[in-house]
Amino acid sequence: MTHQTHAYHMVNPSPWPLTGALSALLMTSGLTMWFHFNSMTLLMIGLTTNMLTMYQWWRDVIRESTFQGHHTPAVQKGLRYGMILFIISEVLFFTGFFWAFYHSSLAPTPELGGCWPPTGIHPLNPLEVPLLNTSVLLASGVSITWAHHSLMEGDRKHMLQALFITITLGIYFTLLQASEYYEAPFTISDGVYGSTFFVATGFHGLHVIIGSTFLIVCFFRQLKFHFTSNHHFGFEAAAWYWHFVDVVWLFLYVSIYWWGS
Protein backbone atom coordinates (compact mmCIF):
# COMPACT_ATOMS: atom_id res chain seq x y z
CA MET A 1 0.00 0.00 0.00
CA THR A 2 1.40 3.42 -0.90
CA HIS A 3 1.71 5.98 1.89
CA GLN A 4 -1.29 8.28 2.26
CA THR A 5 -1.75 11.32 4.50
CA HIS A 6 -5.55 11.06 4.95
CA ALA A 7 -7.95 8.65 6.65
CA TYR A 8 -10.08 7.87 3.60
CA HIS A 9 -10.17 4.69 1.54
CA MET A 10 -9.41 5.21 -2.14
CA VAL A 11 -11.27 2.21 -3.58
CA ASN A 12 -9.62 0.33 -6.46
CA PRO A 13 -11.61 -0.10 -9.71
CA SER A 14 -14.06 -2.99 -9.27
CA PRO A 15 -16.11 -4.99 -11.81
CA TRP A 16 -18.75 -6.03 -9.23
CA PRO A 17 -21.16 -3.06 -9.55
CA LEU A 18 -21.38 -3.79 -13.29
CA THR A 19 -21.83 -7.56 -12.87
CA GLY A 20 -24.33 -6.90 -10.05
CA ALA A 21 -26.40 -4.61 -12.28
CA LEU A 22 -26.28 -7.12 -15.14
CA SER A 23 -27.32 -9.96 -12.80
CA ALA A 24 -30.27 -7.84 -11.59
CA LEU A 25 -31.31 -7.28 -15.22
CA LEU A 26 -31.02 -11.02 -15.92
CA MET A 27 -33.05 -11.89 -12.78
CA THR A 28 -35.90 -9.46 -13.52
CA SER A 29 -35.98 -10.53 -17.19
CA GLY A 30 -35.81 -14.16 -16.02
CA LEU A 31 -38.78 -13.65 -13.68
CA THR A 32 -40.79 -12.26 -16.61
CA MET A 33 -39.81 -15.26 -18.75
CA TRP A 34 -40.78 -17.63 -15.91
CA PHE A 35 -44.16 -15.94 -15.31
CA HIS A 36 -45.17 -15.68 -18.97
CA PHE A 37 -43.34 -18.51 -20.76
CA ASN A 38 -42.66 -20.98 -17.92
CA SER A 39 -38.91 -20.97 -18.71
CA MET A 40 -36.48 -20.66 -15.77
CA THR A 41 -33.23 -20.68 -17.80
CA LEU A 42 -32.64 -16.90 -17.76
CA LEU A 43 -33.68 -16.69 -14.09
CA MET A 44 -31.15 -19.37 -13.10
CA ILE A 45 -28.37 -17.59 -15.05
CA GLY A 46 -29.30 -14.33 -13.26
CA LEU A 47 -29.35 -15.98 -9.82
CA THR A 48 -25.99 -17.69 -10.44
CA THR A 49 -24.40 -14.41 -11.63
CA ASN A 50 -25.86 -12.63 -8.60
CA MET A 51 -24.48 -15.24 -6.16
CA LEU A 52 -21.01 -15.07 -7.75
CA THR A 53 -21.05 -11.25 -7.62
CA MET A 54 -22.13 -11.24 -3.96
CA TYR A 55 -19.43 -13.73 -2.97
CA GLN A 56 -16.62 -11.86 -4.72
CA TRP A 57 -17.76 -8.37 -3.68
CA TRP A 58 -18.08 -9.44 -0.03
CA ARG A 59 -14.64 -11.10 -0.28
CA ASP A 60 -13.10 -7.81 -1.50
CA VAL A 61 -14.80 -5.67 1.17
CA ILE A 62 -13.80 -8.11 3.94
CA ARG A 63 -10.20 -8.10 2.69
CA GLU A 64 -10.10 -4.28 2.57
CA SER A 65 -11.68 -3.81 6.01
CA THR A 66 -10.45 -6.72 8.13
CA PHE A 67 -7.06 -7.55 6.63
CA GLN A 68 -5.86 -4.30 5.02
CA GLY A 69 -7.25 -1.90 7.64
CA HIS A 70 -8.86 0.52 5.18
CA HIS A 71 -12.01 0.98 7.29
CA THR A 72 -10.75 3.76 9.54
CA PRO A 73 -13.18 5.64 11.85
CA ALA A 74 -13.70 8.26 9.10
CA VAL A 75 -14.56 5.55 6.54
CA GLN A 76 -16.89 3.80 9.03
CA LYS A 77 -18.71 7.10 9.61
CA GLY A 78 -19.35 7.38 5.86
CA LEU A 79 -20.56 3.77 5.73
CA ARG A 80 -22.95 4.45 8.64
CA TYR A 81 -24.45 7.46 6.85
CA GLY A 82 -24.74 5.35 3.70
CA MET A 83 -26.60 2.57 5.52
CA ILE A 84 -28.94 5.05 7.22
CA LEU A 85 -29.78 6.67 3.86
CA PHE A 86 -30.29 3.23 2.30
CA ILE A 87 -32.78 2.27 5.04
CA ILE A 88 -34.59 5.63 4.59
CA SER A 89 -34.90 4.87 0.85
CA GLU A 90 -36.35 1.44 1.76
CA VAL A 91 -38.88 3.10 4.09
CA LEU A 92 -40.04 5.28 1.16
CA PHE A 93 -40.15 2.18 -1.07
CA PHE A 94 -42.60 0.46 1.31
CA THR A 95 -44.53 3.72 1.83
CA GLY A 96 -45.57 3.42 -1.83
CA PHE A 97 -47.13 0.00 -1.20
CA PHE A 98 -48.97 1.18 1.92
CA TRP A 99 -50.20 4.20 -0.06
CA ALA A 100 -51.57 1.91 -2.79
CA PHE A 101 -53.24 -0.31 -0.17
CA TYR A 102 -54.90 2.52 1.78
CA HIS A 103 -55.88 4.38 -1.42
CA SER A 104 -57.79 1.28 -2.54
CA SER A 105 -59.19 0.18 0.85
CA LEU A 106 -60.30 3.45 2.49
CA ALA A 107 -62.60 4.37 -0.43
CA PRO A 108 -63.46 1.14 -2.30
CA THR A 109 -64.81 1.78 -5.80
CA PRO A 110 -68.07 0.30 -7.16
CA GLU A 111 -65.94 -2.19 -9.16
CA LEU A 112 -64.81 -3.68 -5.83
CA GLY A 113 -68.41 -3.91 -4.61
CA GLY A 114 -68.06 -0.75 -2.51
CA CYS A 115 -66.52 -2.77 0.32
CA TRP A 116 -63.15 -4.00 1.57
CA PRO A 117 -62.05 -6.77 1.22
CA PRO A 118 -63.60 -6.72 -2.29
CA THR A 119 -66.58 -8.96 -3.05
CA GLY A 120 -65.50 -12.57 -3.56
CA ILE A 121 -62.19 -12.27 -1.68
CA HIS A 122 -61.74 -14.43 1.42
CA PRO A 123 -58.87 -12.85 3.40
CA LEU A 124 -56.46 -14.85 5.55
CA ASN A 125 -57.20 -15.13 9.27
CA PRO A 126 -54.82 -12.67 11.02
CA LEU A 127 -54.82 -14.82 14.19
CA GLU A 128 -53.34 -17.91 12.49
CA VAL A 129 -50.07 -18.01 10.46
CA PRO A 130 -49.69 -14.18 10.28
CA LEU A 131 -49.73 -13.95 14.10
CA LEU A 132 -47.16 -16.76 14.35
CA ASN A 133 -45.01 -14.91 11.78
CA THR A 134 -45.27 -11.75 13.91
CA SER A 135 -44.12 -13.68 17.00
CA VAL A 136 -41.22 -15.22 15.06
CA LEU A 137 -39.96 -11.85 13.77
CA LEU A 138 -40.35 -10.15 17.17
CA ALA A 139 -38.37 -13.01 18.77
CA SER A 140 -35.67 -12.59 16.10
CA GLY A 141 -35.51 -8.86 16.96
CA VAL A 142 -34.80 -9.82 20.58
CA SER A 143 -32.13 -12.38 19.61
CA ILE A 144 -30.30 -9.98 17.23
CA THR A 145 -30.17 -7.40 20.07
CA TRP A 146 -28.80 -10.13 22.37
CA ALA A 147 -26.15 -10.91 19.74
CA HIS A 148 -25.21 -7.22 19.42
CA HIS A 149 -24.85 -6.74 23.18
CA SER A 150 -22.85 -9.97 23.49
CA LEU A 151 -20.48 -8.75 20.75
CA MET A 152 -19.99 -5.37 22.43
CA GLU A 153 -19.17 -7.19 25.70
CA GLY A 154 -16.71 -9.52 23.95
CA ASP A 155 -18.85 -12.62 24.65
CA ARG A 156 -18.17 -14.57 21.44
CA LYS A 157 -20.02 -17.76 22.43
CA HIS A 158 -23.32 -16.03 23.24
CA MET A 159 -22.99 -13.78 20.19
CA LEU A 160 -22.76 -16.84 17.91
CA GLN A 161 -25.65 -18.56 19.73
CA ALA A 162 -27.93 -15.52 19.43
CA LEU A 163 -26.97 -14.93 15.79
CA PHE A 164 -27.69 -18.57 14.95
CA ILE A 165 -31.12 -18.30 16.62
CA THR A 166 -31.87 -15.12 14.60
CA ILE A 167 -30.91 -16.80 11.30
CA THR A 168 -33.02 -19.88 12.16
CA LEU A 169 -36.04 -17.68 12.97
CA GLY A 170 -35.54 -15.75 9.69
CA ILE A 171 -35.52 -18.99 7.67
CA TYR A 172 -38.56 -20.26 9.63
CA PHE A 173 -40.43 -17.01 8.81
CA THR A 174 -39.63 -17.47 5.10
CA LEU A 175 -40.92 -21.07 5.14
CA LEU A 176 -44.12 -20.01 6.93
CA GLN A 177 -44.67 -17.22 4.41
CA ALA A 178 -44.12 -19.62 1.50
CA SER A 179 -46.66 -22.09 2.95
CA GLU A 180 -49.14 -19.23 3.46
CA TYR A 181 -48.75 -18.16 -0.19
CA TYR A 182 -49.21 -21.76 -1.35
CA GLU A 183 -52.46 -22.15 0.62
CA ALA A 184 -53.87 -18.62 0.09
CA PRO A 185 -57.46 -18.65 -1.29
CA PHE A 186 -56.66 -15.74 -3.67
CA THR A 187 -53.86 -14.94 -6.13
CA ILE A 188 -51.86 -11.91 -7.30
CA SER A 189 -54.25 -11.59 -10.27
CA ASP A 190 -57.35 -11.24 -8.04
CA GLY A 191 -57.71 -7.50 -8.56
CA VAL A 192 -56.29 -4.75 -6.39
CA TYR A 193 -56.54 -6.82 -3.17
CA GLY A 194 -54.43 -9.67 -4.54
CA SER A 195 -51.86 -7.38 -6.15
CA THR A 196 -51.35 -5.09 -3.12
CA PHE A 197 -51.25 -8.08 -0.74
CA PHE A 198 -48.72 -10.14 -2.68
CA VAL A 199 -46.52 -7.24 -3.80
CA ALA A 200 -46.26 -5.72 -0.30
CA THR A 201 -45.81 -9.00 1.61
CA GLY A 202 -43.70 -10.47 -1.22
CA PHE A 203 -41.20 -7.60 -1.21
CA HIS A 204 -41.07 -7.84 2.58
CA GLY A 205 -40.35 -11.58 2.26
CA LEU A 206 -37.56 -10.77 -0.22
CA HIS A 207 -36.09 -8.33 2.33
CA VAL A 208 -36.20 -11.05 5.01
CA ILE A 209 -34.22 -13.35 2.66
CA ILE A 210 -31.69 -10.53 1.99
CA GLY A 211 -31.42 -9.78 5.74
CA SER A 212 -30.93 -13.49 6.51
CA THR A 213 -28.14 -13.58 3.90
CA PHE A 214 -26.43 -10.60 5.61
CA LEU A 215 -26.67 -12.38 8.98
CA ILE A 216 -25.34 -15.70 7.58
CA VAL A 217 -22.28 -13.84 6.21
CA CYS A 218 -21.82 -12.21 9.64
CA PHE A 219 -22.10 -15.64 11.33
CA PHE A 220 -19.29 -17.13 9.21
CA ARG A 221 -17.19 -13.99 9.67
CA GLN A 222 -17.60 -14.25 13.45
CA LEU A 223 -16.53 -17.92 13.30
CA LYS A 224 -13.29 -16.60 11.75
CA PHE A 225 -12.87 -13.93 14.48
CA HIS A 226 -13.45 -10.98 12.11
CA PHE A 227 -15.40 -8.84 14.60
CA THR A 228 -14.16 -7.12 17.75
CA SER A 229 -16.15 -5.25 20.40
CA ASN A 230 -15.28 -1.89 18.78
CA HIS A 231 -14.87 -2.81 15.08
CA HIS A 232 -17.95 -4.62 13.74
CA PHE A 233 -19.79 -2.32 11.34
CA GLY A 234 -20.66 -5.22 8.99
CA PHE A 235 -22.68 -6.82 11.78
CA GLU A 236 -24.12 -3.51 12.96
CA ALA A 237 -25.44 -2.70 9.46
CA ALA A 238 -27.03 -6.17 9.21
CA ALA A 239 -28.67 -5.67 12.64
CA TRP A 240 -30.07 -2.27 11.63
CA TYR A 241 -31.47 -3.81 8.45
CA TRP A 242 -33.06 -6.66 10.44
CA HIS A 243 -34.78 -4.21 12.82
CA PHE A 244 -36.11 -2.31 9.78
CA VAL A 245 -37.55 -5.56 8.34
CA ASP A 246 -39.09 -6.25 11.76
CA VAL A 247 -40.83 -2.86 11.96
CA VAL A 248 -42.12 -3.06 8.36
CA TRP A 249 -43.73 -6.42 9.17
CA LEU A 250 -45.58 -4.92 12.17
CA PHE A 251 -47.06 -2.25 9.86
CA LEU A 252 -47.94 -4.93 7.27
CA TYR A 253 -49.58 -7.13 9.90
CA VAL A 254 -51.67 -4.33 11.42
CA SER A 255 -52.63 -2.77 8.06
CA ILE A 256 -53.10 -5.63 5.60
CA TYR A 257 -53.73 -8.74 7.72
CA TRP A 258 -55.63 -7.34 10.71
CA TRP A 259 -57.36 -4.07 9.68
CA GLY A 260 -57.60 -5.03 5.99
CA SER A 261 -59.36 -8.33 6.73
Curated annotation (Swiss-Prot):
Residue pairs linked by disulfide bridges in the UniProt entry: none
Matching InterPro entries: Cyt_c/ubiquinol_Oxase_su3, Cyt_c_oxase_su3_dom, Cyt_c_oxidase-like_su3, Cyt_c_oxidase_su3-like_sf, Cyt_c_oxidase_su3_a-hlx
Residue ranges, Mitochondrial intermembrane side: 35-40, 106-128, 184-190, 257-261
GO molecular function: cytochrome-c oxidase activity
Cellular location(s): Mitochondrion inner membrane
Catalyses which reaction(s): 4 Fe(II)-[cytochrome c] + O2 + 8 H(+)(in) = 4 Fe(III)-[cytochrome c] + 2 H2O + 4 H(+)(out)
One BP term from GO: mitochondrial electron transport, cytochrome c to oxygen
Keyword terms of this UniProt record: Membrane, Mitochondrion, Mitochondrion inner membrane, Translocase, Transmembrane, Transmembrane helix
EC class: translocase
SUPFAM superfamilies tied to this protein: Cytochrome c oxidase subunit III-like (SSF81452)
Gene Ontology CC: one annotated term: respiratory chain complex IV
Primary site of residence: mitochondrion
Mitochondrial matrix face residues: 1-15, 67-72, 153-155, 224-232
Transmembrane segments: 16-34, 41-66, 73-105, 129-152, 156-183, 191-223, 233-256
Quaternary structure annotation from Swiss-Prot or TrEMBL: Component of the cytochrome c oxidase (complex IV, CIV), a multisubunit enzyme composed of 14 subunits. The complex is composed of a catalytic core of 3 subunits MT-CO1, MT-CO2 and MT-CO3, encoded in the mitochondrial DNA, and 11 supernumerary subunits COX4I, COX5A, COX5B, COX6A, COX6B, COX6C, COX7A, COX7B, COX7C, COX8 and NDUFA4, which are encoded in the nuclear genome.
Family, as annotated: Belongs to the cytochrome c oxidase subunit 3 family.
Family matches, as PANTHER family: CYTOCHROME C OXIDASE SUBUNIT 3, CYTOCHROME C OXIDASE SUBUNIT III
Protein task: Component of the cytochrome c oxidase, the last enzyme in the mitochondrial electron transport chain which drives oxidative phosphorylation. The respiratory chain contains 3 multisubunit complexes succinate dehydrogenase (complex II, CII), ubiquinol-cytochrome c oxidoreductase (cytochrome b-c1 complex, complex III, CIII) and cytochrome c oxidase (complex IV, CIV), that cooperate to transfer electrons derived from NADH and succinate to molecular oxygen, creating an electrochemical gradient over the inner membrane that drives transmembrane transport and the ATP synthase.
Name of the protein this chain belongs to: Cytochrome c oxidase subunit 3
Organism: Bos indicus (Zebu)
